[in-house]
C-alpha cells in the first residue's frame, strides 16, 4: 500500500499566498502555469510574451490573493481571467489600440 499526500486545494493555496507563503504561490504556478501560458499564447502568438503575461499574473496573485472570493469564481477561472486581461492589454498596447472614453 503506497502513501500519498493529500492535494492542497487551490483555495487553500490562495489563503496561504495571502498570508505570505511563497511556496504556495509556487505550487499554484506549477499547477496552473502551463494552461495559463497556452491561453496567453493563443492571444499573443508569442511564447516570450505569453511567459511574461503569466509571470505578471502570478505577481498580481501575490498581491490580490486576500481579495479572492471563492464563492464568485473557481481559482482556475480567476487565474485564467487575470491572464486573459493581461494578454489583451499587452496585445492592445503593442497594436496601438486606444480606448475612447467620452
Predicted stretch roles:
Residues 1-12:
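Extreme N-terminal regulatory/targeting segments of RNA polymerase sigma factors
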Residues 11-14, 22, 26, 47, ...:
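Short, structured helix-loop boundary elements
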Residues 18, 45, 55-72, 93-95:
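Sigma70-family region 2
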Residues 15-38:
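A short, charge-rich alpha-helical start-of-domain segment used by transcription regulators
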Residues 8, 19-22, 101-102:
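Amphipathic alpha-helical segment used for protein-protein interaction
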Residues 38, 52-59, 63, 73-85:
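Structural recognition of an alpha-helix C-terminal capping motif at a helix-to-coil junction
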Residues 91-102:
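Short, charged, intrinsically disordered terminal tails
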Amino acid at each position: 500500500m503506497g502513501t500519498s499526500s493529500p492535494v492542497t486545494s487551490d483555495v487553500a493555496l490562495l489563503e496561504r499566498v495571502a498570508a505570505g507563503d511563497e511556496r504556495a504561490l509556487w505550487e499554484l504556478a506549477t499547477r496552473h502555469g502551463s494552461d495559463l501560458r497556452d491561453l496567453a499564447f493563443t492571444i499573443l502568438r508569442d511564447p516570450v510574451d505569453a511567459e511574461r503575461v503569466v509571470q505578471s499574473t502570478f505577481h498580481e496573485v501575490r498581491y490580490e490573493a486576500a481579495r479572492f472570493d471563492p464563492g464568485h469564481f473557481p481559482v482556475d477561472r480567476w487565474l485564467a481571467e487575470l491572464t486573459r486581461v493581461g494578454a489583451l492589454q499587452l496585445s492592445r498596447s503593442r497594436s496601438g489600440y486606444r480606448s475612447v472614453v467620452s
